[in-house]
């Protein structure tokens, strides 16, 4: 072991310090002149420089192709949703401006087929480039034709029907002036736009050059002009050269009916092609071979031609012709000859229905009647629009239906309302009185913002107008769980006609100021109440109640209540005995009783309470009198005039016979039935004469007026005393 070896000493590492954080001044050189210039700059100037930097970044974003693509996709999504607002048109103009101003940094998209287009990274040129001042020179119909024809050229390029700058597709603008649209000679199909098309006449002279400086292929237009001159029904002509079409045109058998596409073409015409058409004899021969009804013409060893009454129909026939030629070429290559093929019978072939049925589950009415090729062409236009071509094609029937939000209170909330609660000059506070005044306005605003249970569907074009019309249809289905609807004045499942009639009736009542007690109670309707008339009850018979039929059973009472209700049984018995005594007694007895009555004062303690003031009907339970007179004499009588003085009671006049009988009572111990509260005084002849009419009216109340034949009229008059109110008036006159 070495002597230098020593014991190892374990030492701990020094404590680690916190890492140094980089600060702003560590990254800035204080001696840098740029830093010194920025530090010494005024704050306003420094802010202006910062704003310039921000604007520079915004300009870079606006000029970037990625931003343009994003903006274009957003606009396309808004177009699919429909209901284009005003702001969407502004976005479209911005997108068009950005598309035209931004340079195409990516390589151009390879043309010649749909697969090549899907692999491309470049931006396509829009078909509908008629913007601003370019669209003023054309009417609406020509704009649509230009967009359709330019989109047709793009479709021909995507399907591979183009042959460099050759082949032509033309359309007739109008029949009056015989103007036609054709592609400029030297322009590829992928470059054709609506504004670049050239307008020519029937001789091939240029009428409108469009947006290019290119001319027209006169030799190529000769074929089209010959067909247009011979067929006034032709609106569009397509002339293309495809390999399969050229192969079929070279076959002696021609186009064989071996596929449905071949049978859908109808009668196929053939023409022996001898080169470029330059003379008139060739035109006449083409017109003769085409005939008046053929839609398809095959040029021998050259190409294919289709004629249509519209752009869509011409596309339909040329597409089926190309497909039929490809099927025939491939079939003959595999079959070994036309003798080995099975041919279809054109007489048994049934054409496809052009009008599809109504989609299931929809109640929006019948779909538009499609013409030949319209449905297929519209589907392809939709494809081009989805790819960003912006064809400008007017769609007749939308493919995607907007799914309605079922059971939602607000489908599309109102963006603008015509009612405002506060003006610009208001302070923001609202008084309670003004708040109450605005209640009706708030209810109307809430109703305007509420949704409706209908769905809006777009109707397609019809023969009279190319515009689409909005049609409201009822929403299918019903809510399973609903809450109480506030202010529901019209109940559900109510006939609208009845509601309108009731509303008009209420308005008429308000105009005529007719106020009633309201509707009749449904609970007590039809319940009849039979009330038995109690004797002595006063029944009111109101004319208004009877006329309004609120009380059908009304008893009209012509007499008053019973005056004997206040008398006791003892008093009634005494009255009955006195009446019998009067009937049996003689005149002498009556005179004696009268004299005794005058001598002896009446007993004031036996005076009963005064009878009621109203003339009443006697009770039916009074004892029957032994005479043969009718009970109606004692039960009914006409009421006497009441006393006009408030101090004296009027009952004394109502019952004079009762008072007289009480004075004629022979028994002094027996209390009379009725007595006058004032002391009796001798009647005067004048008073008797004045009182005679009143007593004659009350004579039916006298029990002995009819029964005793021995009584003379003079003694009847002596029985009655002078009424109290006449005595009082006489005293006043004497004084």
Curated annotation (Swiss-Prot):
Subcellular location per the Swiss-Prot or TrEMBL entry: Cytoplasm, Cytoskeleton; Cell membrane
Region (Disordered): 1-21, 418-487, 576-735
Annotated positions of the Phosphothreonine modification: 331, 358, 429, 445, 480, 610, 614
CDD domains xrefs: Aldolase_II
GO CC, any one term: plasma membrane
Compositionally skewed regions (Basic and acidic residues) per UniProt: 440-455, 576-601
Entry text on domains: Each subunit is comprised of three regions: a NH2-terminal protease-resistant globular head region, a short connecting subdomain, and a protease-sensitive tail region.
Name of this protein: Alpha-adducin
């Amino acid at each position: 072991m070495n002597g230098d070896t020593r014991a190892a000493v374990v030492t701990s590492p020094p404590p680690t310090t916190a890492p140094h954080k980089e600060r702003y001044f560590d990254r800035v050189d204080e001696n840098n002149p740029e830093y010194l210039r920025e530090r010494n700059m005024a704050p306003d100037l420094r802010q202006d420089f910062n704003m310039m930097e921000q604007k520079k970044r915004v300009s870079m974003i606006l000029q970037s192709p990625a931003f343009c693509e994003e903006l274009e996709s957003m606009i396309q999504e808004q177009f699919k949703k429909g209901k284009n607002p005003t702001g969407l048109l502004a976005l479209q103009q911005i997108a068009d401006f950005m598309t035209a101003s931004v340079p195409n940094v990516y390589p151009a998209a390879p043309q010649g087929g749909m697969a090549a287009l899907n692999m491309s990274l470049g931006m396509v040129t829009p078909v509908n480039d008629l913007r601003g001042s370019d669209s003023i020179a054309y009417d609406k119909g020509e704009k649509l034709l230009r967009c359709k024809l330019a989109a047709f050229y793009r479709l021909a390029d995507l399907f591979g029907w183009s042959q460099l700058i050759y082949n032509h597709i033309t359309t007739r603008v109008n029949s009056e002036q015989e103007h036609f649209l054709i592609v400029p000679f030297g322009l590829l199909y992928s470059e054709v736009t609506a504004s670049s098309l050239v307008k020519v006449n029937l001789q091939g002279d240029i009428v409108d050059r469009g947006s290019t400086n290119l001319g027209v292929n006169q030799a190529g237009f000769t074929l089209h002009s010959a067909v247009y001159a011979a067929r006034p029904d032709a609106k569009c002509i397509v002339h293309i050269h495809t390999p399969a079409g050229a192969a079929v045109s070279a076959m002696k058998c021609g186009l064989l009916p071996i596929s449905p596409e071949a049978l859908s073409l109808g009668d196929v015409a053939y023409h022996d092609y001898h080169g470029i058409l330059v003379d008139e004899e060739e035109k006449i021969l083409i017109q003769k071979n085409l005939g008046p009804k053929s839609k398809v013409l095959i040029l021998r060893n050259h190409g294919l031609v289709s004629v249509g009454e519209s752009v869509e129909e011409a596309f339909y026939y040329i597409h089926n012709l190309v497909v039929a030629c490809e099927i025939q070429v491939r079939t003959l290559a595999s079959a070994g000859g036309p003798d080995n093929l099975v041919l279809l019978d054109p007489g048994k072939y049934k054409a496809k229905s052009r009008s599809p049925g109504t989609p299931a589950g929809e109640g929006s009415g019948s779909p538009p009647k499609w013409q030949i090729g319209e449905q297929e062409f519209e589907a392809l236009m939709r494809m081009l629009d989805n790819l960003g071509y912006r064809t400008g094609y007017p769609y007749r029937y939308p493919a995607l239906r907007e799914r309605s939000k079922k059971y939602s209170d607000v489908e599309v909330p109102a963006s603008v309302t015509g009612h405002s609660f506060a003006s610009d000059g208001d302070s923001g506070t609202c008084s309670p009185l003004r708040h109450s005044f605005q209640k009706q306005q708030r209810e109307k605003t809430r109703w305007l913002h509420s949704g409706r249970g209908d769905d809006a569907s777009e109707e397609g074009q019809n023969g009279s107008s190319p515009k689409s019309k909005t049609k409201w249809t009822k929403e299918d289905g019903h809510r399973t769980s609903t809450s109480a609807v506030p202010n529901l004045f019209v109940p559900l499942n109510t006939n609208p006609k009845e509601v309108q009639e009731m509303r008009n009736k209420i308005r008429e009542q308000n105009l005529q100021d007719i106020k009633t007690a309201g509707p009749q109670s449904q609970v007590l309707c039809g319940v009849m109440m039979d009330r038995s008339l109690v004797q002595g009850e006063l029944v009111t018979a109101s004319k208004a109640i009877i006329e309004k039929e609120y009380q059908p059973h009304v008893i009209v009472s012509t007499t008053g209540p019973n005056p004997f209700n206040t008398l006791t049984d003892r008093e009634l018995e005494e009255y009955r005995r006195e009446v019998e005594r009067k009937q049996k007694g003689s005149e002498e007895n009556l005179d004696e009783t009268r004299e005794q009555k005058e001598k002896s004062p009446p007993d004031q303690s036996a005076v009963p309470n005064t009878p009621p003031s109203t003339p009443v009907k006697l009770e039916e339970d009074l004892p029957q009198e032994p005479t043969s007179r009718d009970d109606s004499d004692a039960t009914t009588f006409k009421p006497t005039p009441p006393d006009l003085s408030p101090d004296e009671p009027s009952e004394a006049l109502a019952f004079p016979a009762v008072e007289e009988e009480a004075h004629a009572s022979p028994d002094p111990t027996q209390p009379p039935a009725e007595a006058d509260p004032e002391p009796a005084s001798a009647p005067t002849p004048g008073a008797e004469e004045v009182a005679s009419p009143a007593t004659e009216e009350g004579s039916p109340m006298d029990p002995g007026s009819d029964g005793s034949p021995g009584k003379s009229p003079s003694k009847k008059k002596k029985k009655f005393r002078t009424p109290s109110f006449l005595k009082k008036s006489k005293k006043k006159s004497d004084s």
